[in-house]
Each structure stands twice: as C-alpha cells, then as structure tokens.
Amino acid sequence: MGLRALLRLALGFPAPPRRPPLVQCALAGTGPRRLIAYLTPGSQGWILDFLWRDLTATSVWGDGEAPELLVASDRNSLASMMEGADAFVLVMFQGHLPRLLRDGIPAERVILYMSHVRIGLGLPDLSRLHGVLALNAHEEALLRMQGVESERLHRFPAGYDPRLFFPGRPLAQRRFDVLFVGRYVGSSNSNYHQRKRYPLLCDLIGLLSHQGLRVAVLGNGWQACEYPLPAALELIDAPHSDYGAVYRQTRLVCSVSAQEGGPVSFLEGLVSGCLMLSVATGFAADFQSGVDGIWHLPLKAEAPLWCEQIQACLLAAQADPDLGSGVCSPARQAFLEAAQFERLALQLRQLCDQSLIGGSMERSDG
C-alpha cells in the first residue's frame, strides 16, 4: 500500500479502490491480432464513431493477415479483448487516456487519436505510447514540442470518402452562396457551444441573408436554436451520405469555429470545389490565406467583417476562372489525397503491423 493510502487510513478515510492489474498482452505473433477502438457510449452518433466506421469499411482490412477489428465501450470490455492477444487499442478521445493507463492498459499498446488540444486536460507521457495520430500540422508541431518522437508521431488528416465527395459544376451554376455545416448544440454544453461560437454564426447568417445571399445550414438540431434566424435560411437535415450533393450545390463553405482539429467539413468542401473561409485553425491553417480559394479571418473578427469577406470571396471567384471552375487545383488535390479513408486506413494498418517501439511488459507463454 502506498504512502498516500496509508495516510488516508490514518486520518480515518476509506482506502482508495485497488487499481486493476496490468493487462497482459501476448507477444507479437503468439496471440490473436486485434485492433480495438475505445469508444464510450457518449461517442455514439458523433464524429469519432463515424470515423471508425469509415476507416474499418475500407478494403485495407480484407486479407487474412489483418487484425480483427473490435469496439470496446468500457475499461473491462477493453481489458478482456486485449488479455492474451497481440492487440492495440485506438483511443479516440485523449480525455480517456490517463484513466485507461492507470487502470492497467499497457501504454505501449495504445495508439492515441489526438483531435485537438483541450485546455485543462492533462495528458501522461505520450512518448510511452505506440503511436500518436495528429490531425494537422499545428497539432503535430505542439506534440513535437511536448517531446513525442518522430517514429511515434503520424499525420492523420481524417478523412473523407472520394466516392461521396468530388468536384461539381462551376460555382456560378450552384444553388447556395454560403453553406455552414454542423449540428446545433445548445448552451447547456458550454464548452462545445463556446468553441463553435453559435451567437456569432447566427448574427452572420442574418447579415448574409439581409444582403440577399442564399444561405443554408447543413446539420441537425437547428430547430432548437436559441438565437434568431432569418426566414430565408434553408435548414438541411440529411444523412451524411447525401452531404456531397449539398456541397456540390454550394459556392462557399464558412466556419466561424474558434478551434478545430479538422473539421471534416473542410475536407468535404475542399474536394467539392467550394471556396473556403474560416479562422486559421485545424486543416485551414495548413494553407496560406488568400491562395487557392482559401481564406482566413482573425479570431476577433465580428460578424460584419465576416460578411464583407464572404462577399469579397464570391466576387474573387467570379473574376478568376480557375477559382470559379468548381474543380480542385493541384495544391488542393495533393492535400486531399492523404486524407482519403483508404489511405488513412492503410496508414493505421501499417502502424498495427509495426513492432513495438521500445520495451514492453507483455507476457511470454513459454
């Protein structure tokens, strides 16, 4: 028993619960191969759930040497799947990582999907993990500064399906001038609500509509919006398989979100030939503002400046045949090739096929 536990007992407090023992995985090649996604019930219906589904639906996992693909929703189910297996766990939310490591999940068997930095969320030593997946260049740079070695760090710009998302007709022939993408989440979820900046977004929608622009929002939950929206706004609640058709009817995709790891809508709009405007966060920060149909605004910009910039972007596309063509430029295409689900799944498969980096604490049945 540790000193802290003894002190608690001396002061009359109950002893802390015992930590579970370290999960004992098999040595490489001596047990069933498994890749397990750790997705708690709170992830269901959100982007991490969809990401795992799309990655595992690719042909990369179809051969007899591929690991078995499983999902665990709690620590106990995860431990039972890993025990005695040559297994890796893909932790899809960094907030789960410290508890899993404390509860006996071997660090060298963890691949962490790092979506974006979250203030106040402490992380253990990531250099102990088998791999860390970073969505964009900014997150990758932060992880390098934190000391994550290059052999463990991988760019993972997840992701889109090119069968659903591809270039459309010229911008002048498209139905919507401006599209905003994402579900509405009420102010009771303060962190998400603040990050997505719904008050600013709704103010901007009102200004754009007042200017006569055709504006749409793609996503669910907007009927419960707490802020006024113009009657002319078109609300589109469609399955994700239909999103590509909406992008191909759109001239410009806008996001006012204060922080993103992606978002996926940036990839989907980019490959659909849309103009893109956002804060310099996530994937957008990998591009120079004002080049190749991609623009950034400062975080402090208010709704009138966003409205003015959107109108300037639309005018620029009218004057530039390349921007207005609705076809991906070579620079966009190079970025997008690495973000296709098939490419990402192959990258994840190769990571699972790698030998463990450094020492391990696995058992040998010999």
Task: For the regions a language model picked out, list residue spans one by one.
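N-terminal pre-catalytic "stem/leader" segment of glycosyltransferase-like enzymes
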Residues: 1-92
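Aromatic "clamp/platform" in nucleotide-sugar-dependent glycosyltransferases that forms part
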Residues: 258
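Short hydrophobic beta-strand element within catalytic cores of glycosyltransferases
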Residues: 275-278
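Extended catalytic core of nucleotide-activated donor transferases of GT-like folds
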Residues: 56-142, 147
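Conserved catalytic-core segment of nucleotide-activated headgroup transferases in glycan assembly
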Residues: 177-226
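Acidic anion/phosphate-binding donor-loop and adjacent secondary structure
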Residues: 121-123, 159-175
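A charged, aromatic-enriched C-terminal amphipathic alpha-helix characteristic of glycosyltransferases
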Residues: 301, 305, 321-353
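Nucleotide-activated donor-binding/catalytic signature segment of Leloir-type glycosyltransferases, i.e.
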Residues: 221-241
